[in-house]
């Protein structure tokens, strides 16, 4: 019946883990199929895979599946498995006893809660239970009760695809074949035939077509359609090849699940090919396709958006797809599209503080808030929904016009570490979970006291597209600033991919730039920047110390990262090459502790410019070759006869200690180096 209707359904088995698994085994023996089993514990001989490896299933298909959530619920893995199952499939979801489930520790919370032990996740579990019970197409079998008897409503028989393009696919293929240059971005929900269409394009194209994506396994469906005409490349390997060879004879580059590839890498690849087809999922395990359109595609000069709406792997109104969408809020990133700013000059915009307890009592608020975040940040995934609903230390504000959410702000508590632990973070010896900015200021900017202070980091901020450029984000931030100050916090912070536009925005909000990383972020292709808004005297002192350190060090940092000087820094024209107290502390941390070279780079550069006698007494070949002569680590390792990079780092530290001893008696060091051994 289900196969005839083209539908898939969910059966929830709730009870003890052993009972649930035994029922799943029994049912799998009664129904022939592939029976993909996702969980940390699966029966011997099962076609099983752990939740953390579920992405390897992408691009594949199977009949029937089991998802074991008795110990923890990995929502991304559940979404992946649901997308893999074809028409006629049952998905068996194994969960703890129904009434106990929300109270039990969830092992998956270790991935996103920033806690040292699993926590219970009552808000998300109650939300999920509510969706499961509300669906007439979900069957619940609880231990100690009789199994449900599935009742299927009469529906017309489904006509599965016969291998030829659907009307929708054919129209898109014709459009693609007529194109001479540009980038086409194909978005669709799972099961709509994106990969199949890409394979058809390869099969019909007269020229060479190359394929790339986050993993070769994910292109299985595409390859089946394209045969041996599609050559697969890993993204980084393809870029390296393009940089060294002529690829002008390649007509098409096909990028599967493009939103999963770092934007800088994707941009670099597109420059080498006249035509490119990028496919990405509208909503799912990797994030949102709509956000991908807003963020990445807006940077392209010649791109075209195309979409597939009709499913081909199952029939329309599929029960399994609908319940997964309801649980993950996959359909809620469009809910703000109809909000018009007409009359906004007189519209009353209210800033509302939201707590996690509000999400269950006001499901519409949750849908609007999370939907807005999903549409604005294309790497928003189901993991973020789990964190938003149950992770400790989360704070939220919503900008509302009447009952509509037009702005969303998400903040995370940071700091409060013990002094000894903060020193260990500074020394490079410890890196506990959480406190992203606070720990980074200690580990990379020398501000060891940052993790001790109480702070709150802005994690996400989003404003509905039609309501932007009206100061709504600044209103929300100002409200949270007052709230945090009233609670006795020391500072607010933010981490962002550095662009002039974003730097100016945060500066206008009162934040001061205090750190710029030495490497570009994979997600944004920009250097990671951090800014602080002080709220207390201690926060003022930290902010000023970190800002002045960045200004003083900028001469050497800029040579390392090649970034234009931020307008808010105003560094001196000539670098300060004297060694001050902060430099000696930094050098001691590098020489006698485990601070990374990148964090100590300006102090090391100053060290190398000291007394000329130092060059005779301590030539420091490893440091000089790397910092002054621009040699690669591989070249230095070979030149000095070292065993590898680890030995080179040890050599760097030894040379730093040697130079310090020559310039300043060890007994007079400002830092007791014994603390760092």
Swiss-Prot record:
EC category name: transferase
Pfam families in UniProt: GNAT_acetyltr_2, NAT10_TcmA_helicase, tRNA_bind_3
One of the protein's GO biological processes: tRNA wobble cytosine modification
Sample GO molecular function, one term: tRNA binding
Statement: the UniProt record of this protein carries the keyword Cell division: no
Reaction catalysis annotation: cytidine(34) in elongator tRNA(Met) + acetyl-CoA + ATP + H2O = N(4)-acetylcytidine(34) in elongator tRNA(Met) + ADP + phosphate + CoA + H(+)
The keyword Calcium is annotated on this UniProt entry: no
Span of domain N-acetyltransferase: 351-533
Cellular component terms (Gene Ontology): cytoplasm
Localization terms from the record: Cytoplasm
PROSITE patterns: GNAT (PS51186)
PANTHER family: N-ACETYLTRANSFERASE 10, RNA CYTIDINE ACETYLTRANSFERASE
Protein name: tRNA(Met) cytidine acetyltransferase TmcA
């Amino acid at each position: 019946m289900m196969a005839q209707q083209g539908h898939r359904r969910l059966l929830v088995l709730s009870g003890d883990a052993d009972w649930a698994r035994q029922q799943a085994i029994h049912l799998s023996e009664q129904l022939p199929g592939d029976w993909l089993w996702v969980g940390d514990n699966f029966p011997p001989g099962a076609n099983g895979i752990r939740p953390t490896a579920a992405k390897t299933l992408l691009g594949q298909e199977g009949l029937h599946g089991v998802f074991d959530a008795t110990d923890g619920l990995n929502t991304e893995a559940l979404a992946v498995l649901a997308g893999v199952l074809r028409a006629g499939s049952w998905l068996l979801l194994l969960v703890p006893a129904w009434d106990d489930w929300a109270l039990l520790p969830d092992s998956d919370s270790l991935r996103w809660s920033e806690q040292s032990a699993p926590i219970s996740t009552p808000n998300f579990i109650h939300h999920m239970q509510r969706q499961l019970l509300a669906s007439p197409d979900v069957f619940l079998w609880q231990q100690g009760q009789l199994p449900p008897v599935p009742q299927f409503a009469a529906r017309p028989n489904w006509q599965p695809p016969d291998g030829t393009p659907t009307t929708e696919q054919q129209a898109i293929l014709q459009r693609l074949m007529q194109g001479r240059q540009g980038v086409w971005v194909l978005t669709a929900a799972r099961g709509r035939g994106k990969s199949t269409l890409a394979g058809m394009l390869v099969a019909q194209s007269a020229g060479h077509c190359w394929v790339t994506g986050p993993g070769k396994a994910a292109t299985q469906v595409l390859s089946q359609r394209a045969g041996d005409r599609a050559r697969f490349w890993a993204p980084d390997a393809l870029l390296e090849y393009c940089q060294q060879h002529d690829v002008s004879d390649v007509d098409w580059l096909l990028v599967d699940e493009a939103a999963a590839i770092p934007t800088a890498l994707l941009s670099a690849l597109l420059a080498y090919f006249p035509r490119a087809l990028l496919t990405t999922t509208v909503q799912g395990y990797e994030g949102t396709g709509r956000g991908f359109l807003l963020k990445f595609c807006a940077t392209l000069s010649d791109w075209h958006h195309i979409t597939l709406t009709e499913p081909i792997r199952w029939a329309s109104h599929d029960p399994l797809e609908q319940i997964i969408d309801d649980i993950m809020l996959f359909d809620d990133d469009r809910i703000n599209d109809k909000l018009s700013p007409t009359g906004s000059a007189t519209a009353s915009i209210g800033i509302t503080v939201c707590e996690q307890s509000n999400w269950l009592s006001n499901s519409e608020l949750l849908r609007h808030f999370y939907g807005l975040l999903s549409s604005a940040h294309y790497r928003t995934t189901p993991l973020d929904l789990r964190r938003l609903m149950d992770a400790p230390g989360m704070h939220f504000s919503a900008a509302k016009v009447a009952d509509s959410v037009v702005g969303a702000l998400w903040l995370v508590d940071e700091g409060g570490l013990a002094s000894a632990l903060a020193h260990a973070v500074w020394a490079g010896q410890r890196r506990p979970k959480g406190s992203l900015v606070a720990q980074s200021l200690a580990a990379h900017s020398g501000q060891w006291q940052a993790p001790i202070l109480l702070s709150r980091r802005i994690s996400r901020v989003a404003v509905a597209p039609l309501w932007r450029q009206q100061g709504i984000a600044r209103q929300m931030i100002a409200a949270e600033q007052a709230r945090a100050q009233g609670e006795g916090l020391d500072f607010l912070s933010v981490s962002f991919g550095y662009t002039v536009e974003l730097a100016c925005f945060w500066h206008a909000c009162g934040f001061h730039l205090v750190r710029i990383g030495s490497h570009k972020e994979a997600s944004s292709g920009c250097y990671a920047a951090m800014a602080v808004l002080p709220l207390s005297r201690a926060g003022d002192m930290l902010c000023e110390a970190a800002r002045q350190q960045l200004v003083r060090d900028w001469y050497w940092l800029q040579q390392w990262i090649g970034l234009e000087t931020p307008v808010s820094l105003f560094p001196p024209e000539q670098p300060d090459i004297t060694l001050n107290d902060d430099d000696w502390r930094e050098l001691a941390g590098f020489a006698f502790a485990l601070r990374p070279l990148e964090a100590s780079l300006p102090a090391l550069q100053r060290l190398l410019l000291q007394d000329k006698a130092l060059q005779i007494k301590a030539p420091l070949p490893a440091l000089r070759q790397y910092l002054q002569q621009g040699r690669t680590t591989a070249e230095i390792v070979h030149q000095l006869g070292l065993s590898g990079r680890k030995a080179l780092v040890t050599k760097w530290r030894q040379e730093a200690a040697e130079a310090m001893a020559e310039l300043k008696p060890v007994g007079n060091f400002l830092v007791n180096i014994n603390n760092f051994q």
